[in-house]
Design a protein with these regions (language model features):
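Catalytic NTP-binding/metal-coordinating core of nucleotidyl cyclase/transferase enzymes
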Residues: 1-83
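Catalytic beta-strand-to-alpha-helix segment of the class III nucleotidyl cyclase homology domain
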Residues: 4, 45, 64-178
């Protein structure tokens, strides 16, 4: 294989960050960090493993995760958001750690330590559109999972997103299962 060959593949990309992280750290750095580490160890990382995801990288308040299956990516996000809501329900709203999640499917460029490409950028922009505790997915994700999962989706229409040339079709995922 030539040295300059680029490793490309189709993947489901899950981007997450903590809403209000700087505020939480400003109020209680040690407590926030302790809670975050516990949430990752006891809930987030096990759910990612359970749903066959690969953590590409973490930042202080976020993470980028790659999945082979978009169904697994959405199920993982729902499990994490439900679990976080349960784990923090007894805390005042201003002390809760709440993730925002964006999921996209796209062609990515991969190297040993990171993933790149428009698919990754769109996932990050979807995450920025999500409410704290919420999940936003692209139309491509919705089209792949709508008949395979029992969660509801709300069409948020075409949304312009920063540094992406075209508007993105966006859907909000309901954490309540359809009956």
């Amino acid at each position: 294989m030539p040295e300059d060959r680029v490793d490309r593949r189709l993947a489901a990309i899950f981007a997450a960050d903590i809403a209000g992280y700087s505020r939480l750290m400003g109020v209680d750095e040690e407590g926030t960090l302790r809670q975050l580490k516990a949430h990752r160890k006891e809930l987030v990382n096990p759910k990612i493993t359970e749903h066959r995801g690969r953590i590409v990288k973490t930042t202080g308040d976020g993470m980028l995760v790659e999945f082979v299956s978009v169904v697994d990516a959405v199920r993982c996000a729902v499990d994490i958001q439900r679990g976080m809501a349960e784990r923090t329900s007894d805390l005042p709203a201003e002390k809760r750690i709440e993730f925002r999640v964006g999921i996209n499917v796209g062609d990515i460029i991969s190297d040993t330590n990171d993933i790149y490409g428009d698919g990754v950028n769109v996932a990050a922009r979807l995450e920025a559109l999500a409410e704290p505790g919420g999940i936003m997915v692209s139309r491509t994700v919705h089209d792949q999972v709508r008949d395979k999962l029992s969660f509801g989706f709300k069409d948020m229409g075409e949304q312009p997103v920063k540094n992406i040339a075209r508007p993105i079709g966006v859907y909000q995922v309901s954490l309540i299962e359809n009956t």
